[in-house]
Amino acid sequence: MDRTGIFAGDDPFAIAAGWLAEAEPQEPNDPNAIALATVDAAGLPNVRMVLLKEIEAEAFVFYTNYGSQKAVEIETSGKAAFVLHWKSLRRQIRVRGLVEREEGAQADAYYASRSLKSRLGAWASEQSRPLASRTSLLAEVARVTARFGTNPPRPAFWGGFRIRPLEIEFWADGAFRLHDRFRWRRNSLSDGWSIERLNP
């Protein structure tokens, strides 16, 4: 298999991290933005942009409100998919897999690294629920600011999700739409990866 150059390597997470590092100085903003897909109880898909915060040795991590629609759908199905797409590189990575919570020390550390206003905002926002007005949201921000001051703890309803892939596809633009695609797949998280080149 002619998997060389930007596709070379035996570790798909290392390849993904390398592509992201390459995109960071070139994308106009948010090179770590992913389009995260879930399905509701009726099987109707939902997709939204969130920020990928970590590429681990065996997983991808993002953070959110556990009461949000995305979180409810993830915890109902235990599965999610996302795509990372970079116009500057003309490349993308697609991921499908199983999801688990990250609500321990790692989530605490990431929450603590955020700006104070973002930490207070996590307390103030009942994410995905109806909101009467922006004024009422700002009033809630003022209330939690008065309550916590400059040291708000991480809310129990806010934390991370770790996506452990069963499938990762790397795609790069090719001339005349003769793109390069390589798919890594495994049947379970304990299995090794099989790799195949796909038609454009």
Swiss-Prot record:
<keyword id="KW-0285">Flavoprotein</keyword>
<feature type="binding site">
    <location>
        <position position="171"/>
    </location>
    <ligand>
        <name>FMN</name>
    </ligand>
</feature>
<feature type="binding site">
    <location>
        <position position="110"/>
    </location>
    <ligand>
        <name>substrate</name>
    </ligand>
</feature>
<feature type="binding site">
    <location>
        <position position="114"/>
    </location>
    <ligand>
        <name>substrate</name>
    </ligand>
</feature>
<feature type="binding site">
    <location>
        <position position="118"/>
    </location>
    <ligand>
        <name>substrate</name>
    </ligand>
</feature>
<dbReference type="InterPro" id="IPR019740">
    <property type="entry name" value="Pyridox_Oxase_CS"/>
</dbReference>
<comment type="similarity">
    <text>Belongs to the pyridoxamine 5'-phosphate oxidase family.</text>
</comment>
<dbReference type="InterPro" id="IPR019576">
    <property type="entry name" value="Pyridoxamine_oxidase_dimer_C"/>
</dbReference>
<dbReference type="GO" id="GO:0010181">
    <property type="term" value="F:FMN binding"/>
</dbReference>
<keyword id="KW-0560">Oxidoreductase</keyword>
<comment type="pathway">
    <text>Cofactor metabolism; pyridoxal 5'-phosphate salvage; pyridoxal 5'-phosphate from pyridoxamine 5'-phosphate: step 1/1.</text>
</comment>
<dbReference type="Pfam" id="PF01243">
    <property type="entry name" value="PNPOx_N"/>
</dbReference>
<feature type="binding site">
    <location>
        <position position="53"/>
    </location>
    <ligand>
        <name>substrate</name>
    </ligand>
</feature>
<feature type="binding site">
    <location>
        <begin position="127"/>
        <end position="128"/>
    </location>
    <ligand>
        <name>FMN</name>
    </ligand>
</feature>
<dbReference type="GO" id="GO:0008615">
    <property type="term" value="P:pyridoxine biosynthetic process"/>
</dbReference>
<dbReference type="InterPro" id="IPR000659">
    <property type="entry name" value="Pyridox_Oxase"/>
</dbReference>
<feature type="binding site">
    <location>
        <begin position="63"/>
        <end position="64"/>
    </location>
    <ligand>
        <name>FMN</name>
    </ligand>
</feature>
<dbReference type="Pfam" id="PF10590">
    <property type="entry name" value="PNP_phzG_C"/>
</dbReference>
<feature type="binding site">
    <location>
        <begin position="177"/>
        <end position="179"/>
    </location>
    <ligand>
        <name>substrate</name>
    </ligand>
</feature>
<feature type="binding site">
    <location>
        <position position="92"/>
    </location>
    <ligand>
        <name>FMN</name>
    </ligand>
</feature>
<feature type="binding site">
    <location>
        <begin position="48"/>
        <end position="53"/>
    </location>
    <ligand>
        <name>FMN</name>
    </ligand>
</feature>
<comment type="subunit">
    <text>Homodimer.</text>
</comment>
<dbReference type="InterPro" id="IPR011576">
    <property type="entry name" value="Pyridox_Oxase_N"/>
</dbReference>
<dbReference type="InterPro" id="IPR012349">
    <property type="entry name" value="Split_barrel_FMN-bd"/>
</dbReference>
<protein>
    <recommendedName>
        <fullName>Pyridoxine/pyridoxamine 5'-phosphate oxidase</fullName>
        <ecNumber>1.4.3.5</ecNumber>
    </recommendedName>
</protein>
<feature type="binding site">
    <location>
        <position position="181"/>
    </location>
    <ligand>
        <name>FMN</name>
    </ligand>
</feature>
<comment type="pathway">
    <text>Cofactor metabolism; pyridoxal 5'-phosphate salvage; pyridoxal 5'-phosphate from pyridoxine 5'-phosphate: step 1/1.</text>
</comment>
<keyword id="KW-0664">Pyridoxine biosynthesis</keyword>
<dbReference type="GO" id="GO:0004733">
    <property type="term" value="F:pyridoxamine phosphate oxidase activity"/>
</dbReference>
<keyword id="KW-0288">FMN</keyword>
<feature type="binding site">
    <location>
        <position position="70"/>
    </location>
    <ligand>
        <name>FMN</name>
    </ligand>
</feature>
<comment type="function">
    <text>Catalyzes the oxidation of either pyridoxine 5'-phosphate (PNP) or pyridoxamine 5'-phosphate (PMP) into pyridoxal 5'-phosphate (PLP).</text>
</comment>
